[in-house]
Amino acid sequence: MSFVEDVGEVPPADELGRVHFVGIGGAGMSGIARILLARGLPVSGCDAKESRALTALRALGADISVGHDPAHVAGADTLVTSSAIRPGNPEVQAARDAGLRVLPRAAVLASVMAGSRGIAVAGTAGKTTTTSMLAVALQACGRDPSYAIGGDLNEPGSNAHAGTGEFFVAEADESDKSFLLLTPEAAIVTNVEPDHLDNYGSADAVYDAFRAFLGRIADGGTVVLGADDEGSRALAPAAAERGLAVTTFGLAEDAGVRIDGLRLSAAGSEFELVAGGRRLGPLSLVVPGEHNAVNAAGVVALGLALGLPYADMARGLAGFSGARRRFEPKGEARGVRVYDDYAHHPTKLRAALAAARHVAAGGRVVAVFQPHLYSRTHDFAADFGAALGAADLVVVMDVFAAREDPVPGVTGMLVAQAVPLPPESVRYEPSWSSVPAVVAGLARPGDLVLTIGAGDVTMLGPEILAALEAAPA
């Protein structure tokens, strides 16, 4: 993967003509395509394989092909690509040869956000859930925001919406610096930690990129920073120097919007929020985990800065049931509950397992972890292993390569060897097809199984449930 280039001024969305997406099934790409379709633009695209996203976009009028062929770009005016597309893709090359406008995904996102009051949610962890919560809170306030999110909201079942209100909420991707193409009025930064080091090269470069992101916020704008994370707190001086209004949120005693009296349970959480010494009132969530309470506090902090009524935000957040692949329940078989989570960074993994511990309510937590990317596994194997120590039983799968080529010596075994549990509680299982039977053999009634990772581990939930049903009583 490489960094996106600043392509300069991008035409307004209604001047892009027919837009062709290479990799249209991706979370970010499909959301933008959905909004363009809602605005009446002709959209086409391709992807490597069929998916639920492709089916949904076809139903909205998109012309979508499976596979990559230069002929697919015929008739297009603008081609959209992303960092997930390998250099030399035949459709991208054909578009360049034909002199078509070729734009990175984030440039088109910036184009569709133009004219709205843009709000960007950035951070190493928690972006998708926080963006989703913010969209729901704005809806509860009667604002009907547009939004583009890296995951499907459970209620509408989609990752994007072309609203009639003034706000446009977007998940801002730091992995390839594409968030530096956005120009929001306001932003939330959940946390800042080293990640995507295959791209950035160093932790300092990651922090520098987030400081540069502050420079993209409109003059006189607002930034809301996570108070519990050193990386995001460290952005406050730079934000103030830019003249931005700065608010913080979290559990920290000095947070501008502070969580007080947090009570966690299998059913979610209950707490009060305090802002400037004033108690705003109670807030309850049905999504589990301390991290989700913190995410909600960030949403409220930004909402207050925008002048939104707390009571309406609290009502919306109380009804928020989550986003797809964010601690998503997959089912139950023989007394064993199965959940799925997208966590692919040590901090996200720790948060997911902490939530699992509360939801398990005394039962054992069985973690099924698939490392994502060879580079990330190499960089964080020890941290992943340490985080997995919060489970009772651990099954580590082999690395999901995604866009990367294999790296000698880098396998899931590196993670398994770093888990601080007895050897009998940790298993390295490189065969994807063997995992369901392995998990069914380990789990017992009352256990909670959590499949974890950004790869195809998400497809294991139904397989594990079937294996549990088929297991001898």
Language-model features: where?
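N-terminal leader/targeting and accessory segments in enzymes
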Residues: 1-108, 230, 255, 280, ...
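P-loop/Walker A phosphate-binding loop and immediately adjacent motor/lid segment at beta-alpha junctions
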Residues: 91-100, 205, 216-221, 242-244, ...
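Phosphate-binding loop of NTP-binding sites
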Residues: 35-38, 58, 72, 83-227, ...
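Short glycine-dipeptide loop
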Residues: 218-223, 361-362, 390, 445-446
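Nucleotide phosphate-binding/pyrophosphate-handling subdomain across enzymes
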Residues: 3-20, 28, 34-39, 180, ...
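C-terminal helical cap/extension that packs against the catalytic core
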Residues: 385-445
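Short internal beta-strands
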Residues: 41-48, 222-227, 366-370, 390-401
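Beta-strand->loop->alpha-helix junctions that form or flank phosphate-binding loops
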Residues: 46-47, 65-68, 103-110, 148-151, ...
